[in-house]
Swiss-Prot record:
Gene that encodes it: rpcA
InterPro entries in UniProt: Globin-like_sf, Phycobilisome_asu/bsu, Phycobilisome_asu/bsu_sf, Phycocyanin_a
GO CC list: phycobilisome; plasma membrane-derived thylakoid membrane
Protein name: R-phycocyanin-2 subunit alpha
Tagged with keyword Transport: yes
Post-translational modification: Contains one covalently linked bilin chromophore.
Amino-acid positions noted as binding (2R,3E)-phycoerythrobilin in the UniProt annotation, renumbered to this chain: C84
Membrane topology note: Peripheral membrane protein
Amino acid sequence: MKTPLTEAVAAADSQGRFLSNTEVQAASGRFNRAKASLEAAKALTSKADSLVNGAAQAVYSKFPYTTQMEGSNYSATPEGKAKCSRDVGYYLRMITYCLVAGGTGPMDDYLIAGLDEINRTFELSPSWYVEALKHIKANHGLSGDAATEANSYIDYAINALI
């Protein structure tokens, strides 16, 4: 899994050199932000159920047709609603993984790589997930550096969808 730190080490090693001062300073900065990232990951994990449920409700409110149309990609049935929550939860889980890893590697490797194909195959609208992520961002309850760290990965996911 790639993170800025692992990429810096790999680049230096492939060039047969030590890390530069700039690379060491970047690593130091990452470790300084790590506490806030871990705090955010812990908070998002502990609030995951309520955040996911609220995000799904935000999708249903903005896109009411999702609860009215029949089909496996809609939320007209309890099974459909469970799938929506599962998918929103997957995005949130990827965000927490990125917070722990200190980079977008988990999201790049496990989510974004096949995102367009998944959405096309199952006729899922990216706008549903953008709305869900906006709800999570607005309601996660984080502040300060923890919020900054979490919001950066939420924004990364949103930008991947649009």
